[in-house]
């Protein structure tokens, strides 16, 4: 696809403000990349799918702009299965071997897994160094690269070990979407749909109208979707950077979705397990069904959401082989829970999400059982 040369930017306000820049060709802009490195050391963290396409170009761009810059590189295996304490340790070792000081910078070149790992390593190395997010997937551009939530998974659950560490900048080169597999594009669109579902009915309607263009990779439609999604997230993160309240709304479908991901053993390139966006799509439908069962919303709203996700070729049902009891056990470990009670993001219809602090497990089990 061809992309407009116009650039869009979204400012994220707060104690540590930064800018999200959205445009084609940004990875070749060495001056822009290097401007965020305060010292003489940078670590480029990428994965086995992304690095062959873009890592050499990023390193060359940095070297042209800053010949004095020492750039290390770590390439991890692609997929959620790499988001572990062991891989995190490899990133820390890479920083140590580079001789990175407190003015070093970690560049996260990849999707959500790379962004989470790089951000967490940056948060921990010498108690915090800069991280610049270079998202190459739609999901990372609209969600995981923005807001400073970083984490790794453990066998007991997803994102249970992590830190809040806002990036120094988010630089989203939309040219990278050209090499994004169709399945990963659809996964990112699930997170885009989420923004309409939680707070923007007009955006929800726009997504329905533009669904064909988005699935076909239309540059203008994708740029609009990315910018609008980032605007929504930036507004929420600025008001609630540490997820003490409103920011939890961004997790619509995630408690159910994370349970599915964890119970399946996480998706990876080439396997049939749901990836993150697909699991969130199923989770949003489950959250909508639970909302209707609790009398919070109309069943027709649930069907409207399910139909839109289906139109984007996203799953809407729990994969076979996962029991309600096993999924509920995973949900009990969700970070949003308080005092051992399920705390879920539900809704009162399209654009009207809210946090429900004490949801009965029996009601959840009934939804999980179908």
Curated annotation (Swiss-Prot):
Domain of life: Bacteria
Chief place of localization: cytoplasm
Enzyme Commission code: 4.2.3.4
UniProt subcellular location: Cytoplasm
Spans through the membrane: none
One matching Pfam family: DHQ_synthase
Any GO BP annotation: aromatic amino acid family biosynthetic process
Pathway recorded for this protein: Metabolic intermediate biosynthesis; chorismate biosynthesis; chorismate from D-erythrose 4-phosphate and phosphoenolpyruvate: step 2/7
Substrates-to-products reaction catalysed: 7-phospho-2-dehydro-3-deoxy-D-arabino-heptonate = 3-dehydroquinate + phosphate
GO cellular component, one term: cytoplasm
Enzyme class: lyase
GO molecular function, one term: nucleotide binding
Chain positions recorded as NAD(+) binding sites: 112-116, 136-137, 149, 158, 176-179
Cofactor: how and how many bound: Binds 1 divalent metal cation per subunit. Can use either Co(2+) or Zn(2+).
Keywords: Amino-acid biosynthesis, Aromatic amino acid biosynthesis, Cobalt, Cytoplasm, Lyase, Metal-binding, NAD, Nucleotide-binding, Zinc
PANTHER family: 3-DEHYDROQUINATE SYNTHASE, 3-DEHYDROQUINATE SYNTHASE, CHLOROPLASTIC
Family the UniProt entry places it in: Belongs to the sugar phosphate cyclases superfamily. Dehydroquinate synthase family.
Function: Catalyzes the conversion of 3-deoxy-D-arabino-heptulosonate 7-phosphate (DAHP) to dehydroquinate (DHQ).
Protein name according to UniProt: 3-dehydroquinate synthase
Record gene name: aroB
